Amino acid sequence: SDTGNTRRVAKSIAKKLGDLADAPVDVKKASVEDLLQYDALILGTPTLGDGELPGLSSGASDESWEEFLPQLEGQDLSGKTIALFGLGDQEGYGHEFVDALIFLYETAVAGGANVVGFWPVDGYSFEKSNAIVDDQFVGLVIDHENQSDLTDERIDAWLSDIKSALTGV
């Protein structure tokens, strides 16, 4: 993202996973082939504009998920385990809180991936989110604007829940 918050969360996740994870790759620099070589993926995105994926039409400075995701659509993701995380601002954008996360989720599910790491909606205050399925967020939700003090704790709890599904360890 333009603020670097998504990158910081990705790096924190990778650091906490240690040797179990490769270094994070910015989607701007990734190819579909890069992603498809892995059996397990952690994908993250901020929400920009009106609940949109980051990309040129949502005001991002570079191409991002908006341009990359169509390349991933239609790919066979069966046999892959995918965990998602999203960043949003529940106070400033509570009417579309982490909405972009649903686009990653729908693409993963449509491709046949096993999506893990659903996250409780408790502890957040927002009006609406499209990123909720079965009363849970489709991935870890980080609000760095209003709850940055909870970021590490949330990452730790989420990784504890998904680590074995992603790594087999």
Task: Walk through the language-model features, giving the residues of each.
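A short beta-strand-loop structural module common to alpha/beta enzyme folds
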Residues: D19-V32, W119
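FMN-binding flavodoxin-like domain, especially the glycine-rich phosphate-binding loop
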Residues: N5-R8, K16, L20, Y38-V169
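TIR-domain catalytic/interaction hotspot
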Residues: A30-A40
